[in-house]
Amino acid sequence: STDSTQAEETTETADTSAAEETAQVSSDEPCEIYMFISSPEYADAIGELIDAYKEVAPNVTINYETTQNDYPTLLKAKLNSGEVPDIFSSTSGKEIDVYKEYSYDLAGQPLTETMSDAVAATMQSPADGSGCYGIAIKGNYFGIVYNKAIFEECGITEFPSTVSAMKDACEKISAAGYKPFTTGFNEWWVYKHVAQHFFDAAAANAGISAAELVSGFENGTAKISDYPELYNNFFDFIDLAVKYGDDKPLETALDGEESAFGTGKAAMVLGQGAWIEADVLSIDPDIQIGFNGYPVTEDASQCQVISGSDQSLHVNKDSAVLQQTLDFMNWWYTSDYGKAWFTDVAGVVPPIKSDVQSNFEIIKQGDELAASAGAADLEIIYSTDSWHQTFGEIMQSYIAGDLDKDGACAQIEKQWQEIDGAQ
C-alpha cells in the first residue's frame, strides 16, 4: 500500500537527514505527545504524517484528536482546567496574542528557516510584531472558484472582476439555465471569507491598512456606512448571491456547495478556496476549475485573491515533553518527507518555501494571480473566531429578513466592539 511505501521511503531518508537524527537522539525515552487541533478535513493526512514520524522516532506516540465544532470552547475548557495540550490550534493573527501566555516562541528553531515569509508574518504577536508562536498546516488561497466550461458556454470570456460585470455575468448564467452561485450560507465562516475581500478594498481606498480598519471597528470609531465598499458593495453582493444562489441558502452547507458545483448545477462557489478541490474532483474528475478574486468595486485591479495562513498550531511552552514536541514540529517543516507532505499527501498550499508545483488548479491559478496581480491582505486574522461566528449569525439574520441592512450594520458595530474591542 502507499502508506507502507511512504513509511519505507521515510525510513531511508531518516538516515540522511540531520533533523531526523536529532529527533531520534532526544526521543529515546518512551513519551506521549497530545495534539488537539481543529481542521478535521486534514485528519487522514495528519494520520499519515504521524505514522511516518513513528518510523523516525519509534518511542514517541502522538495522540491526535481533532474537531471543528466548538473547538475554541473545548480548548478554553482544557486550558482553564490546566490540561494544556502539547500541540493546540487557533486562528493566526489576533489569536496569537490571546494564546501567547501558553505558547512556546519558536523563533530560532530550524523550522523558521523553511517557513514562508507570508506565513511567518501571521505567526508573530500582532501586539508587538515579535516572535514566532506557531506553525501552519497550510498556506491558503481565498477567492471565487468557478466552472470555466459554464462561463465559456455563456459567452463570458473573462472573469467578471468589477461589480457591474458580475451582475451581467449572473444574468447570462441564469438565462442559460444554471445557478450562478452556490453560497454555503448555512456556515458562519463562509461570511468572513467573503467579507474580507470587501474590507481589504475599503481599507485600501481609505488609505489605511486592513489591520487599522479592524481596530477602528473594535474601538467604535469606524462605521460600516463610512465605507461604500462595505455598506453598498458587500451587502449588494450578498443580495446578488441570495437572488442567484441556492434555493434554500441558509440550509446549504459546505457539502451542498461542493455537490452543486461538482455536478455542474452552479457556476461559482462562494466562501471557499483551495481546500474544496479534492472533494469536487471526486464528484467530477474532468471539471474545468477556474479561480479568481471577488469583484469588490468598479476597479478591476481590486479583484484579487487572498493568500496567507489563517491557522496556527501552538506548542505548549510548559509541556512535559517540550523537546520531543519541538523535534516533531521541526521534522515536519525540515525533513524531506515533511516538506513533501504538504503537496503530496495533504494537497495544500505549502506554508514553507517550496519550488514544488501543485497538481491542484486552485493553487496553480492562485500562485499565478498572486504573482501577476498581487494578493490582498488576509483580513480575517485581525479578529477572533468568537467575533467571526457572531458576524456570520448577524448576516444569517439579514438573509432571513429578520434584520434590515441598517439593523445588521448596527449589530455588527455593537458586537464587534463588545467581543473583540475588549480583548
Language-model segment annotations:
Residues 21, 91-143, 167, 193-194, ...:
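Hinge/lid segment of periplasmic solute-binding proteins
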Residues 55-56, 61, 81, 130, ...:
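Extracytoplasmic/periplasmic substrate-recognition and gating elements
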